[in-house]
Amino acid sequence: MEFQHKPVLLEETISNLAIKPDGVYIDGTVGGAGHSGEILKRLDESGTLIGLDQDEFAIKTSQEKLVQINSKAKIILVNTNFVNIKEVCQKNNIESVDGILLDLGVSSHQLDEASRGFSYNKDAPLDMRMDRRGELTAKKIVNEYGREEIKRIIRDYGEEKWASRIAEFIVEARKKKEIETTGELVDIIKAAIPSSARRGGPHPAKRTFQALRIAVNNELGILAKTIEDGTELLKPGGRFCIITFHSLEDRIVKDEFNKKVNPCICPKQFPVCTCGRKPEGVLVNRKPIVPKEKELEENPRARSAKLRVLEKI
């Protein structure tokens, strides 16, 4: 099966990476190689692309595709999570890089491949692991976690106002039978949310599925650490581009980038800074970049995408 993934905000991302032909660039989420391919087109034989993805299938399918695009530039592909960018660079004797890209969306391939269990529109085993080597699955969470912990996950990671009822219904349902598939979970969620609240708006299971995916893959903790390590790796003038798809991720990126721009922790009443923390970067755009109408028509999944860009000082 070919890895189908339409890159989001492609033109805007490539433009903001400000690619140098001899530069070193990290794509922390290779996916279908849409962004990676465009980066490679702009590199010469002195340039390097480091592509990471915790989905083994993405790495396998990208290898051949990328070599066909540019056989002269150095291509390093690693089946790992982007949280390990420092270790990957150390292993390859790379001290600093010119640009880093993270596209935090679940790829169209993963959404469409039923067996991954990411989609509430297709019945499949409850999995949701980006990296199939991981032990924690959505099935384990809904069948083994306590009601309060399930409620916390759905409330905090899904921003779901019906989190308490959904958690209660999950715990009741599993007393009768283990919850094994996405279809079973969708039915439980629909039963938990009053019909009046389900009229209009997104699919009733959307927020709960998002929450479980974030919990299974520790997405928010990993993101904050990667921003810290990635900024450290960047050369002065190097850029960090991150595409988010929901408010939780965007808030973390916004807050972490702002810490790099204004790291001072002195009380506001202090006339001068005494903490000694120096800015590490500047925001390239004050507001996030969002897709143009034309892109939304061609790719509705891009609707919630936001791109934020930090430039290292």
Curated annotation (Swiss-Prot):
Query: Which keywords belong to this entry?
Result: Cytoplasm, Methyltransferase, rRNA processing, S-adenosyl-L-methionine, Transferase
Residues binding S-adenosyl-L-methionine: 33-35, 53, 82, 103, 110
Family per record:
Belongs to the methyltransferase superfamily. RsmH family.
Q: Which gene encodes it?
A: rsmH
Superkingdom of source: Bacteria
Q: GO MF terms on file?
A: rRNA (cytosine-N4-)-methyltransferase activity
Reaction equations catalysed: cytidine(1402) in 16S rRNA + S-adenosyl-L-methionine = N(4)-methylcytidine(1402) in 16S rRNA + S-adenosyl-L-homocysteine + H(+)
| Enzyme Commission number | 2.1.1.199
**GO BP term (any one):** rRNA base methylation
Compartment list: Cytoplasm
Q: Name one GO cellular component term.
A: cytoplasm
Report the top EC class in one word: transferase
Is Methyltransferase given among the entry's keywords? yes
Is Amino-acid biosynthesis among the key words of this record? Answer: no
Q: What does this protein do?
A: Specifically methylates the N4 position of cytidine in position 1402 (C1402) of 16S rRNA.
What Gene3D superfamilies does this protein map onto? Putative methyltransferase TM0872, insert domain, Vaccinia Virus protein VP39
User: What is the protein name for this chain?
Assistant: Ribosomal RNA small subunit methyltransferase H
